[in-house]
Design a protein with these regions (language model features):
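Short beta-strand->loop
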Residues: 99-106, 118-122, 145-148, 214, ...
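A bilobed periplasmic-binding-protein/Venus flytrap-type ligand-binding module shared by bacterial periplasmic
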Residues: 129-136, 175, 246-258, 277
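Periplasmic-binding protein-like
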Residues: 112, 126, 186-190, 196-197, ...
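Extracytoplasmic ligand-binding site segments that recognize negatively charged/polar headgroups
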Residues: 24, 28-40, 61-65, 77-212
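A ligand-binding cleft/hinge motif common to bilobed small-molecule-binding domains
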Residues: 88-92, 208, 212-233, 282
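Extracellular/periplasmic bilobal clamshell ligand-binding domains
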Residues: 295-330
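Mature extracytoplasmic/periplasmic domains
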Residues: 253-308
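Short alpha-helix C-terminal cap/hinge motif
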Residues: 41-57
Length: 330
C-alpha cells in the first residue's frame, strides 16, 4: 500500500503546485515599490482580496533594470506584468516585442498631457528635482545652470542612467537644457558629485545620512517627510528652466502565464484603491482624480514641464548615455 500512498501524495503535491502556479501573478517592479514601506504590500493585499490569487512582486533596482531583465529573459520571462517602466522607456520597451496591448479604459486619467497609449497603463507621475535640507542650506540653487556652473560649495548624489529611471531622467533633463553643450555640463557636475548610485533607494539613503547637500529625487519627495514623519525641513530646489516630467507605467507581458489575472490587475491599476495608495505609498501624483492628502498642497510645482518624446529617447538614449560616460572620464 505504501507505494500507492506515495503516488497519491506525489500527485496531490504536483496538483497543488500547479494550482499555485496558475494562481500566482508575477509582477516585475522596482525595490522601493515592493518594499515594506512602499505601496506594494497594500496593493498586494487589496488585489488578492478580489482575485483569489497570490501576487508575487519581483523587486529589481529600478525601471531601467526591469527593461534590461525583460530583454535578457526574452520569451522565457516569468513576469506576467512589468510595473515601473516610464514614459521615456516606452518606445524602447515596445520594440522588444515582448509586451501586448491592454484593454483598459484610460479616458478618465488626469495626466497633464493626457494619455492614449494602448500598451502601457499609467499609474503615477511626478517631476524630477533635487531635494535638500532647509536647515543645512539657506540658499538652494535656483536653476540647473546655477547648480552646474557656479555652485562649487554643493555636493550632489544622483543615479546611473543605465540602470535607474531617475538617473535617466536627469540625463534627459540635462540634455533638454544644455543640448549640444551637455558634455561640458556633465564634466562640471562631476566635480560636485559624491557618487552615482545604481538606484534611487541607495542615493536617497546616502543623502539622509548626510553624505550630500542635494539628491536627485522628485518634487513630491518632501511630502513623505512632512506626512509620514511630521518633518518639514526637506524641500526641492525649483529650477527656472523647468523640471523633467516622468509618467510611470505598467504593461502586460505577451507571454504571460496568467493572462486573465494580468488583465484583471491592469484594470485594477486605475481603481480608487490602487490610485489612493500612490500619494503616500509611492509619493507621487496619482493619475486619476482621487483626493490628495493634506500636505501635498505645500509642494513646489514646476513653472515648466520638460520632456522628449518616447521615440526620440529610444533613438538617442544610447548616444546620450555615451555622452554622459565620456564626460565622466575626461
Amino acid at each position: 500500500m505504501k507505494p500507492t500512498l506515495n503516488l497519491i501524495a506525489l500527485a496531490a503535491i504536483t496538483s497543488t503546485s500547479a494550482f499555485a502556479a496558475e494562481n500566482t501573478l508575477t509582477i516585475y517592479t522596482y525595490d522601493s515599490f515592493a518594499a515594506d514601506w512602499g505601496p506594494g504590500p497594500k496593493i498586494e493585499q487589496a488585489f488578492e482580496a478580489i482575485c483569489s490569487c497570490d501576487v508575487n512582486f519581483v523587486a529589481l533596482d529600478d525601471g531601467v533594470s526591469i527593461l534590461n531583465r525583460l530583454r535578457l529573459e526574452g520569451g522565457n520571462s516569468k513576469a506576467d506584468i512589468v510595473l515601473g517602466l516610464d514614459n521615456n522607456l516606452m518606445a524602447e520597451a515596445k520594440k522588444t516585442g515582448l509586451l501586448t496591448e491592454h484593454n483598459v479604459d484610460t479616458a478618465n486619467t488626469v495626466l497633464p498631457n493626457g494619455w492614449s497609449d494602448t500598451t502601457f497603463v499609467p499609474y503615477d507621475y511626478g517631476y524630477f528635482a533635487f531635494v535638500y535640507n532647509t536647515e543645512k542650506m539657506a540658499n538652494p540653487p535656483k536653476s540647473m545652470k546655477e547648480l552646474v556652473e557656479t555652485r562649487d560649495d554643493l555636493k550632489v548624489i544622483y543615479q546611473d542612467p543605465r540602470t535607474s529611471t531617475p538617473g535617466q531622467g536627469l540625463m534627459l533633463w540635462m540634455k533638454s537644457i544644455y543640448g549640444d553643450d551637455v558634455t561640458q555640463a556633465w564634466q562640471k557636475l562631476a566635480s560636485k558629485t559624491v557618487t552615482v548610485t545604481k538606484g534611487w533607494s541607495e542615493a536617497y539613503s546616502m543623502f539622509l545620512n548626510g553624505e550630500s547637500d542635494l539628491v536627485l529625487s522628485y518634487t513630491t519627495s518632501p511630502a513623505y517627510h512632512l506626512i509620514a514623519e511630521n518633518d518639514s525641513k526637506f524641500a526641492t530646489a525649483n529650477f527656472a528652466e523647468g523640471h523633467y516630467m516622468q509618467v510611470e507605467v505598467a504593461a502586460k507581458v505577451k507571454g504571460a502565464k496568467n493572462s486573465e489575472l494580468a488583465d484583471q490587475f491592469m484594470n485594477f491599476i486605475l481603481s480608487d484603491e490602487f490610485q489612493s495608495a500612490m500619494p503616500t505609498g509611492n509619493w507621487m501624483y496619482p493619475v486619476t482624480d482621487v483626493e490628495l492628502p493634506k500636505g501635498f498642497e505645500t509642494l513646489s510645482v514646476p513653472n515648466k514641464s520638460l520632456s522628449f518624446s518616447a521615440d526620440e529617447v529610444a533613438k538617442m538614449r544610447k548616444s546620450w548615455i555615451r555622452e554622459w560616460q565620456s564626460a565622466l572620464t575626461f
